A protein has these predicted regions:
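Short, well-structured segments within or immediately adjacent to enzyme catalytic domains
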Residues: 1-128
Length: 128
């Protein structure tokens, strides 16, 4: 689940997301204004080695490194659904996104100048 969709797990704060306070968090559907519901991803496939909790955290302040990595086991693509209900299969462009599964949990995947990470950041939250 998108780490910015906190769903009331934390106290509602004027400071934004628990993870990145300068970005919006979303506790209910009426909180979704930017990006729009059709551009805010809700759930996706996460890379098996990256799974460490119920959220996929996107490092919106570092466009050169994944915190948690989306999956790429659908022929080099990953599935996303969005707040408005539609879903997309995103074909990954960068080798740094298509990481071989090692069955060993870790986080922090280098992705210098990644077009894939830029795509996910743009659809994860918005600057407050």
């Amino acid at each position: 689940m998108n780490g910015f969709v906190e769903g009331g797990a934390y106290s509602k704060s004027a400071n934004g997301s628990v993870w990145y306070p300068t970005f919006f968090n979303y506790n209910k559907t009426t909180d979704v204004m930017r990006p729009s519901p059709s551009n805010l991803w809700l759930m996706n496939d996460e890379h098996p080695d990256s799974i460490n909790d119920g959220w996929e955290i996107t490092g919106v302040e570092d466009p050169n490194s994944w915190v948690d990595l989306p999956a790429s086991y659908h022929n080099g693509a990953g599935g996303f659904n969005f707040v408005d209900g539609h879903s997309e299969i995103k074909k990954w462009l960068e080798p740094s996104t298509r990481v071989k599964v090692k069955y060993s949990q870790y986080n922090g995947f280098p992705a210098p100048k990644s077009r894939d990470l830029a795509w996910v950041i743009e659809r994860s939250s918005a600057k407050r």
